[in-house]
Amino acid sequence: MESMERIIDNDYTKLCAAEEIGKPVLKCEICGKEKMYGRIHMCGKNIDIPVLMCDCAKKAQEEWEEQERKKKIKRNLDWLKANSHLPKAEKTFEEWVHTEATEECYKAYRSFVENYYKGSHGMLVYGDCGCGKSHLSIALATELAKQGVRTIYKNVPELFEDIYESFSGNGISASEIIRPITESSVVILDDLGAEKPTEFVRSKLYYIINSLYNSEATLIVTSNITKISDLKSIIGARSYDRILEMCKFVHNTGTSYRVNIALERESAHR
């Protein structure tokens, strides 16, 4: 059934009442308002199409779209929670403690969320430990999931441990651990470089990164390295080269908030 907007879009010749052109009287099933007929002239013939003259169909469509949007958000939040290494405490952008040293990093994360599109360039965020990279990464993952983006957050040391444990054969396989990562649109690998993996885990890491590259997924990496080149000896040349191609660099120049809190406590007790 055509709507008034469609009538305008298709530039119908005119609107006709049913009685005017000898057509059956049709009414909206919801409000009972009589429908008109939109007449177009095509191939030497008049074609009359019933047209809704009320907003019922539009309202029903909008309600359906809103329901589908909420379902999609729930699916992606459930996906994030089921497949990620998330802490119990929720991390949000609103809870972020702003400092001059970390403001550029914060802005980079917010800008990513606001401007994300499928295939967006990723980020390699590096800097001192304890300066909020994980907090911002978790907040980003949650916001993207709410936008309907399939996102996953993995703490790399925990991911490596999961892969090591898969060798025992008592749990899930390495392939099953990796599959949700390669099926996501945005993947966050947090704390890469905290430990040097075995060659087997290196190969799995490259498989993950290369799969994301081939599927045009977006990769976000955080690391406590002081120089980007330090990653090469830790994760291997192949993974390193892929990250350089997939990510822009964001340097978090902040210092550890845990150290700052400890210093404040010490100062208060003097």
Question: Predicted segment positions?
Answer:
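Residue-level preference for the first positions of well-ordered beta-strands
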Residues: 120-124, 150-151, 186, 218-220
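Walker A/P-loop nucleotide-binding motif
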Residues: 119-137
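Short glycine-rich substrate-engagement loop in P-loop NTPases that contacts/grips substrate
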Residues: 103-107, 120, 141, 145-183, ...
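Phosphate-binding P-loop
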Residues: 112-120
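Hydrophobic residues at beta-strand termini and immediately following loops
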Residues: 96, 154, 250-252
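A short, basic N-terminal segment
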Residues: 1-103, 254, 262-270
